């Protein structure tokens, strides 16, 4: 899933701001109708709810993640990814700014 750029896309100009600016992303729209968000999460512990399934690809930084229904935290860093089921949630702990791509399923 690792690519360095996305070609022939549209980018929504307005940023998605969550948790008082602790998470900032922009939506990228592809010609086939799929979408992704490119964003950063600043140091915090946050809980995200999902509608569609998501694949979170980490570009830079390190995070700890706990999926809904799990007691265990998993650590992910640059070049790694984790899957989140649809209609679910996950906790994420970030100590230094995290750069990510969210792929929607």
UniProtKB/Swiss-Prot annotation:
It holds the Pfam family Ppnp. GO terms for molecular function: guanosine phosphorylase activity; purine-nucleoside phosphorylase activity; thymidine phosphorylase activity; uridine phosphorylase activity. It catalyses: a purine D-ribonucleoside + phosphate = a purine nucleobase + alpha-D-ribose 1-phosphate; adenosine + phosphate = alpha-D-ribose 1-phosphate + adenine; cytidine + phosphate = cytosine + alpha-D-ribose 1-phosphate; guanosine + phosphate = alpha-D-ribose 1-phosphate + guanine. It comes from the Bacteria. One of its GO terms (cellular component) is cytosol. Gene3D superfamilies: Jelly Rolls. The keyword Glycosyltransferase applies. Its EC number is 2.4.2.1, 2.4.2.2. It is an enzyme of class 2 (transferase). InterPro entries: Ppnp, RmlC-like_jellyroll, RmlC_Cupin_sf. Keywords: Glycosyltransferase, Transferase. Catalyzes the phosphorolysis of diverse nucleosides, yielding D-ribose 1-phosphate and the respective free bases. Can use uridine, adenosine, guanosine, cytidine, thymidine, inosine and xanthosine as substrates. Also catalyzes the reverse reactions. Belongs to the nucleoside phosphorylase PpnP family. This is Pyrimidine/purine nucleoside phosphorylase. It comes from Cupriavidus pinatubonensis (strain JMP 134 / LMG 1197).
